[in-house]
Amino acid sequence: MDALYTQKILALVAKIDRIGQLDAPDARASGVSKLCGSKVCVDMNMRDGIVTDFAHEIEACALGQASSAIMAREIIGATSDELRIVARDMRRMLKENGYPPQNSDRGGNWSELSLLESVRDYKNRHASTLLTFDAVEDCLVQLGV
């Protein structure tokens, strides 16, 4: 279990940006892990298929907070396709022994999600780690992009 809570993961938890809610989000979605009760709620604005603003409220374990911290740092400027690819790669990394997400062509530093690769061996932690991705994808569906 100590392998999960590395200093790098704890450093992410200590600096989570974009906490709160947007005044007038284009989409809002939340997710709850049935296993541990972790909860994430995200607000998102998009213009011309690109994320222009984002905020989130997080009541989650360190792993859910760490993935949310990376999401908040990298999401502005991302396209719906980029976000779907990152979410797909995260699921593959955790559930199918896949490779971690890679940096995007526009410069999104998604490769830092590799810090969560050790979660793969703890299936009971997958849901909380993926909450932010699930909520963002729900927002994309709401926006029809």
State what each model feature region is.
Residues 67-79:
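Alpha-helical support elements that line or immediately flank enzyme active sites
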Residues 59-65:
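Short, thiol/selenol-centered motifs that function as redox-active sites or metal-ligating centers
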Residues 15, 19-58:
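Structured beta-strand/loop patches that form or line metal/cofactor-binding pockets in enzymes
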Residues 36, 63, 124-125:
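Secondary-structure capping and boundary motifs in well-ordered enzyme cores
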Residues 35, 69, 103-104:
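Proteins with a high burden of low-complexity, intrinsically disordered sequence enriched in S/T/G/P/A and R
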Residues 1-19, 78-145:
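C-terminal binding/interaction regions
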